[in-house]
């Protein structure tokens, strides 16, 4: 543990960013690839199945929101406590995290199953897509707890200095999912039900992978993939006595996790509203196009989020240790990496939108293909400055100031985007939905640049005050 802490305190910031980014990015790439391949196989079933999966997508994103509520909050608090050299408190946070996940998973499952049909109809399903969406979700509901224990705990693993474990856990689930998707759709012809079972099994295996590491502290087998050896031992151990809920710990976790939770929840709710508006103006095909957009969007968001995750332990540790110069440098490097990642994504979308549409819907009509290409180019036209909307709010979470992140996230998703989309869709119908996104990205980027400028000045002032105290 001391070695990991020393590197966070002393090593080159850029070197640390790359070290933590690469395994997180590889894990994210596999997850995104799974997402794309999963939609690819669903698209092979039918356009209705693709649209149905698109409706279910935002429900699954609600599950992710709850995983982030506890997981991101726990990861941030663990980073800060380790920076303060409070290892025992960090282990208590881990125990409380497991308990919170178990309670949330059971409650969420019960609430969702009470009236699934109504939820789906309000989410943009229609008579054509409801059977597909319902079949998919009835199976996926069993994956809530495994999803919490796999995806949710990756933030804690990163905070504990074991990002490769988080990477391999995601890879185990995603690769299993991809293989089973192919078998289910192309070999067994089980339709959307088969893809749902593939997702369930993948999440279960990933959860087992993570939980074994946390409980045993190491792995029973040696793993070497592309030069990445999984030889880490856990600096945090799951102990039964730490699983009893502690109000101060839960409060700390939820206060920081509230920002990504609200962001993801707002994104999910806005997505459900968007689906309903798209279905009203564009029917099943409109929802299918929206599903394609939502299949590619994580390529950008997960890449930039990998940057945000990579700097979280660096910023959290150094902020707790009052190394403000290193905090400032890490923030600027993260902003640059986020902009660069988004720029690569933008170039690809602008160059080959036709191929991106046909990948999911090869039977698309000429008119439908034209509409899909137009939608992609408009929707992602200002995606580069949009990367700031991930990096900067996550920075505030990492430094234990969730209130700023909550305000920023709600401003973007609810106040700006939802309002703009409703107005634009009334004026330009389906095109209005596509134009609402870049308009929101532009306005929000201006707001974030102001916040970034103010924060950099604060960090400079804190560093100067610290140096003055040392001189005395």
Question: What is the role of each PLM region?
Answer:
Residues 1-24, 78-143, 187-257, 315-382, ...:
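Short alpha-helical transmembrane segments in multi-pass integral membrane proteins
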Residues 8-40, 44-45, 61-73, 77, ...:
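N-terminal transmembrane alpha-helices
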Residues 19-38, 139, 150, 173, ...:
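Transmembrane helical elements of multi-pass membrane transporters/channels
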Residues 24, 28, 40, 57, ...:
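Transmembrane alpha-helix boundary and packing residues in multipass membrane permease domains
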Residues 29, 33-51, 120-127, 183-190, ...:
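Helix-terminus/linker motif at the lipid-water interface of multi-pass membrane proteins
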Residues 50-110, 147-166, 287-353, 386-408:
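Small-residue-rich hydrophobic transmembrane alpha-helices
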Residues 62-65, 177-181, 207-211, 298-302, ...:
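Hydrophobic transmembrane alpha-helices of multi-pass small-molecule transporters
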Residues 71, 140-158, 166-177, 195-210, ...:
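Short runs within selected transmembrane alpha-helices of multi-pass transporters and secretion channels
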